[in-house]
Amino acid sequence: MKLIIQDGKEEDHLQVLNKQLEIGIDEVGRGAVFGPVFSAAVVLTEKNGYTLKQLGVTDSKKLTEKKRKLLLPKIISLSSDYSLGQSSAREIDQLGIRYATELSMIRAIKKLKSKPYEVIIDGPLSLRLWKSHQRNIIAGDSKFTSIAAASIVAKVTRDFLMERLEKKFSGYFIFKNKGYGTKEHLLSLKANGVTNLHRKSFLTKLNLI
């Protein structure tokens, strides 16, 4: 690959190109008691990041479900690349939520077509198994469009999975609670028991099993 000079250093063209891209990472479902934790990675150019910001891309928690679903195809269309990773309820129970969340992020990063020079991660969770450059940004989904876009991709995708699982796990109100420990959900556990997709490590701490 042809070498070019960047800030007095020789770097290959692909590395310089990757530095011009913003790669945001975010997770969803970390605090749920049912189902996997999802992470998304979204790669944006500065121009397309600005366009998405103008379209209303921000922290997924600040958007309605309808707005998130409307923005998803726009994010996919304008991103240079995007990917998803997840860790199952079983992995969460075996590894702990911190490590399982980190694993889901790394799985998302590894699915990207090219190795990123640097990733920007929402929150304080550093990726111990990722040896490349990374930045942790508190409230990053409100500050970086790529992280905000990743939060929307992860949220819409996980919510869709929860809605599909409602048919198989009826009686737990998964369609409504999306796997989170609402009062209705926790009461249903006493009536219906624990499924193989419930996070038993979480339920143990809540004295539910």
UniProtKB/Swiss-Prot annotation:
Its cofactor is Mn(2+); Mg(2+). A divalent metal cation binds at D26, E27, D122. Belongs to the RNase HII family. It catalyses: Endonucleolytic cleavage to 5'-phosphomonoester. Pfam families: RNase_HII (PF01351). This is Ribonuclease HII. Its EC number is 3.1.26.4. HAMAP family: RNase_HII_B. The gene is rnhB. InterPro entries: RNase_HII, RNase_HII/HIII, RNase_HII/HIII_dom, RNaseH-like_sf, RNaseH_sf. Manganese or magnesium. Binds 1 divalent metal ion per monomer in the absence of substrate. May bind a second metal ion after substrate binding. Endonuclease that specifically degrades the RNA of RNA-DNA hybrids. NCBIfam families: PRK00015.1-3, PRK13925.1. PANTHER family: RIBONUCLEASE H2 SUBUNIT A, RIBONUCLEASE HII. GO terms for biological process: DNA replication, removal of RNA primer; mismatch repair. It is an enzyme of class 3 (hydrolase). GO terms for cellular component: cytoplasm; ribonuclease H2 complex. It is found in: Cytoplasm. Keywords: Cytoplasm, Endonuclease, Hydrolase, Manganese, Metal-binding, Nuclease. GO terms for molecular function: manganese ion binding; RNA binding; RNA-DNA hybrid ribonuclease activity. Residues 20-209 form the RNase H type-2 domain.
